[in-house]
From Swiss-Prot:
Domain of life: Eukaryota
Recorded coiled-coil stretches: none
Similarity section: Belongs to the AIM6 family.
Protein name: Altered inheritance of mitochondria protein 6
CDD domains: PI-PLCc_GDPD_SF_unchar3 (cd08577)
GO terms of molecular function: phosphoric diester hydrolase activity
Signal peptide start-end: 1-17
Disruption of the gene: reported phenotype: Impairs respiratory growth.
Amino acid sequence: MLGLKGCLTILIGYVIAVCALFSSRGRNPSLTDWEKLKDQKISNIDNFGLTGQHLLEFFQENLPFLSFSEEKYRHKHVSLYYDVFKEYILRRASSKKCLPVDSAIAKLNKDVNPMPVHSHNDYWRKLPLFEGLAYGASSTEADVWNIDEKILAVGHNEAYLDPVELTLDKLYTGPLLEILDEVNCQDSDADRKNGVFFNSPETSLFFYIDFKSDDNELTYKLLMEQYFKSLIDSGYLTYYDMKKDEIIWRPVTVILTGNYPTSLDILDNGNDNGYFESSQRFAFLDAPLLSLEPKYSKLSVAATVSFSQLMKHCGSDHWKVSLRGRMDSNEISCAKSIIDGAHALKLKTRIWGAPTWPANLVETISRQIIHDLGSDLLNLDNLFMASSLI
C-alpha cells in the first residue's frame, strides 16, 4: 500500500496535470504552439478556429512563424501581414468545394455581430476591407483616383498611389466577389443573396466610393463597366428598381461621395431605363444632410454631414463642444431634429469629423452621436474603441 507521502505525491501530480489541461483550454494558440509547426506552411492550414478580433491578434503575434517557410512571401504585394492574411482568408474561395460554413466570411466574423460603424479611411488599415469585416463594421470606404484613364487606384493622397497593387479591384471588389461567391454557391434563388456577415447574412455592407479625380464621369464609367460589373452580374449590388420605384437590397450597397457626378444623365448613361438599360440604378448618392430634398429618397440610402458643419448649423461651434467635453441640450435637440428629418426620408445618417482626441472626449461625443442624436453610423478610425461604444 502507498504511504501518506506516496498518496500526496500522486495527488499533487494529478492536480498539476488537471491545471495544465484547463489552462490550455480557452486560450488562443501561442508562439510556443507554433514552434511545433515550424516545418508547416500556412498554405497547409485551412482554419485556425479563430474569428474577429482574436484572429487579427493571433496573426499579428505569430506572423513570423506563419510566413517564414513560404518563399512566395519574400516579395510583398501590399505588406507581409496583408499578403499572409489574405492568403489564409481566401484559400477556400478558389476551390470548387461549396461549404459556406468554412468560408472566408466564417473565418472573418463568425460569432461577431454587425455593428453600425463606418470604417473611416479603411484603406489606411493594415488589412483593408478584412479588418473592418472582422470587427463587424457595416460600412467601409475607399478613396479612388483615376490613373491613365483606366485604373482606379486607392489612396488618400495622389502623391502616394500604387496603381499596381493598391487598386480598387485588388483591395476591395475582387475579394468581395470571391467571398460572396463562397456563401452563395448553394442558393440559385436570384432574389436571395447572402452577405458578408456570418451572423447576419441579410445585412448589406455600405461601400462608400470617394471620388478624388477631377474627371468624375470617367471614374463613374470605370466603376460601372469594369470594377463593379462582376458584382452586378452576380446580383450582389443593391439597386433602385425604376419600374417598381423601390430599393432592392443586396449584400453590398454602393454610395458615391466626394467629387461624384450628380447628373442623372451620367448616372444612367444617357438612358431612361438605367446605365445598362435594365431599369436598375446600382449606385446611390451621399445625400447632404443639411439640405435634404424629397428626391433623395430615391437617389440615396444615406445622408452625411461633418460635425463642424452640424454644430455651426445649430448655432454653435465644434471647438466649444470640445472644450465643454460634450454637446449640450440645445445642440442635441437641434442636431436630432435634422437626423429625424433624414429618417423621415428613410435615409441612414453619418456624421464625420467629430473630435478624435483625447480618448474620453471621443467616447463621450461618439455615445451622444449614436444614442442621443440617433445617428445610424458611427464614423471612427479606431474599430476597437467603436466596438466598445455600440
